[in-house]
A protein has these predicted regions:
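Divalent metal-coordination and catalytic microenvironments
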Residues: 10, 25, 30, 49, ...
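Metal-associated gating/positioning segment near the N- to mid-region
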Residues: 47-107
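His/Asp/Glu-enriched, well-ordered alpha-helical/loop segment
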Residues: 264-298
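Histidine-rich, glycine-flanked metal-binding segment
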Residues: 1-53
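Short catalytic-loop micro-motif centered on adjacent basic/acidic residues
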Residues: 85-89, 193-197, 251-255
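Histidine/acidic-residue-rich, glycine-tolerant segments that coordinate divalent metal ions
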Residues: 90-93, 105-240
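Glycine-enriched alpha-helix->loop->beta-strand junction motifs that scaffold or abut catalytic
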Residues: 153-154, 213-218, 243-250, 270-276
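Conserved beta-strand positions in the central sheet of alpha/beta enzyme cores
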Residues: 87, 158, 220, 252, ...
Length: 298
């Protein structure tokens, strides 16, 4: 057999055994096949000292390019980072998701899935006041209609709990979000509820948030250092977070430029607490503090 490519000397990951080892890979028409070490006629790629990975999935970015002040073009960001699929984390809501789908998702070579924002206008970042998360503005019927229209594209809901978005509403926005997520699941659609938890107001403490989340829901910006954090007075990950993980709550790093801290990461890493690595790439931090997903993996 003549192979299209042979990748030699690369480090591959055996996810079944959780092991790393050096291996040659043989490719024909874009697929890995059994190899013959004596074969020739292929283009040889020397991957000595490098990891050879499948396409990565990044769980948090903002791709409404030209539609809000966070948006970046996925095809500029993702290929150089080895990302083939990515989640847009609530850039748009029911007011503007159609535009994002037509002008962003359909045109992208990178496969983009989305969490639709519970607030109709989507994320409003970079201002003193963000999107106002008034639970009265969360329309379950409208949101469900979008899940029915775009079941292949919309995979969950996004809510941003922060001083600038939910202060004064307490946990009511999250309570409403949980009700909507449960209704969508009851209708037969997979639905992750992803909750941004950074710079939390006093009326929405971490303990209250965790009590409301269901197994499979996601707590985002785990290592942030604005206001209440995940640590107790001894710098240990708090018991309520460890208990929440045991009952199936997912914890996402969400290493945004202002929503993470190296000291927090270092202390939490001792317990290998996070389950999802993500880098919330957006136009305002593409060339700044954030680093690619592969750096987070290392």
């Amino acid at each position: 057999m003549v192979y299209d490519y042979i990748i030699r000397n690369g480090i591959v990951i055996d996810f079944q055994r959780n092991q790393f080892y050096k291996k040659d890979l043989y490719l024909v028409k874009g697929r890995i096949v059994e190899g013959d070490p004596s074969a020739d006629g292929a283009e040889i790629i020397d991957a000595e000292g490098k990891y050879v990975l499948p396409g990565l999935i990044d769980m948090h970015a903002h791709y409404f390019y030209g539609g809000n002040n966070l948006g970046i073009n996925a095809d500029i960001l993702c290929p150089s980072q080895g990302i083939t699929t990515s989640i847009d984390a609530g850039s748009t809501g029911t007011m503007n998701f159609d535009a994002f789908y037509r002008n962003g998702m359909l045109d992208s070579m990178t496969e983009i899935k989305a969490y639709i924002n519970l607030i109709p206008e989507g994320v409003k970042a970079g201002y003193k006041r963000g999107e106002c998360c008034d639970p009265d503005d969360m329309d379950c019927d409208q949101i469900l209609a979008f899940f029915k229209k775009y079941p292949h594209a919309i995979k969950g809901l996004k809510l941003r709990i922060a001083e600038e978005t939910t202060k004064g509403f307490g946990l009511e926005p999250l309570e409403k979000a949980v009700q909507i997520a449960e209704k969508i699941r009851w209708e037969g659609y997979p639905c992750v509820l992803a909750v941004h938890c950074a710079n939390l107001p006093e009326d929405a403490p971490i303990s209250g948030i965790l009590q409301l989340l269901k197994p499979g829901d996601s707590y985002t910006h785990l290592y942030q250092n604005l206001g209440e954090t995940i640590f107790d007075s001894d710098r240990k990950v708090r018991k309520e977070l460890r208990d929440a993980r045991k009952r199936g709550i997912l914890f996402e790093t969400g290493n945004g430029s202002i929503h993470w801290s190296i000291p927090n990461l270092t202390d939490a890493y001792k317990t290998a607490f996070s389950r999802i690595l993500s880098v919330p790439m957006q136009c305002c931090n593409l060339f700044g503090k954030n680093h690619p997903s592969v750096c987070s993996m290392q």
